[in-house]
């Protein structure tokens, strides 16, 4: 119920012990889910990067949408896609792991652990999200390149990585705690709710209808999760915009932002409406592209 349409198309498990494990072994060995996740991420980043930049400025400075857009206009078209390489590398890698590892780990846990499917799927989702966090340095560099305060310090991904090197390996993983929390819980909700949501949509009878349903399903989930985890991303962005100095805890940074924004919840969610629409489009594209590629590859 909680698995994707690709799960439903797997060969049925037979009673013979020899035949019982072969579908799972075959699925674990496949790279299709990794490739589809990678391509879906590339498609998404290329389309939505300018929107993400506006959102980033709002998260970091607490400014309005119009002011963030004006900042980007002043930066010029030349800088519009500045910093796209880290998210492109990060998203293609992490989404490949997110979809691929989830499928593989779900099969392995289901085979070796006598627990309800929702439990094994949940554990697989958390483990996939935790593995994604290995690539935190890419998200870290993306934050620095998008922050106009650092424009004069480095102009490309290589220079940004080099600037962090002198501060030690820990500097690359600044902001790891909120990323681990966000990845694990959001993966559980995404994979757990994707199936039930699609089941409640009108039955698709054509390829285009399936594509629309997959877009709606992914978009609704992405928008909901993007809004739910927005404050965590605000804190994560603030933590990762710093180079060197004290490693401040999540509660400490949250308290500082809370005071800066007059202790008003609405100010903490400044930019959330744009994030909602970006996530709606972004995860709609990701889910629709992923499911489409699963059928054609």
From Swiss-Prot:
Subcellular location: Mitochondrion inner membrane
Bilayer-spanning residue ranges: 36-56, 85-105, 116-135, 179-199, 215-235, 268-289
GO BP: any one term: aerobic electron transport chain
InterPro entries recorded: Mito_NAD+_Carrier, Mitochondrial_sb/sol_carrier, Mt_carrier_dom_sf
Keywords: Membrane, Mitochondrion, Mitochondrion inner membrane, Repeat, Transmembrane, Transmembrane helix, Transport
Reaction(s) this enzyme catalyzes, per UniProt: NAD(+)(in) = NAD(+)(out)
Domain of life: Eukaryota
Amino acid composition bias (Basic and acidic residues), ranges on this chain: 1-11
Membrane topology note: Multi-pass membrane protein
Chief place of localization: mitochondrion
Gene3D superfamilies listed in its UniProt record: Mitochondrial carrier domain (1.50.40.10)
Mapped Solcar repeat ranges: 28-108, 116-200, 213-296
Family label: Belongs to the mitochondrial carrier (TC 2.A.29) family.
Job description of the protein: Mitochondrial membrane carrier protein that mediates the import of NAD(+) into mitochondria. Mitochondrial NAD(+) is required for glycolysis and mitochondrial respiration. Compared to SLC25A52, SLC25A51-mediated transport is essential for the import of NAD(+) in mitochondria. The transport mechanism, uniport or antiport, its electrogenicity and substrate selectivity, remain to be elucidated.
Name of the protein: Mitochondrial nicotinamide adenine dinucleotide transporter SLC25A51
Organism lineage string: Eukaryota, Metazoa, Chordata, Craniata, Vertebrata
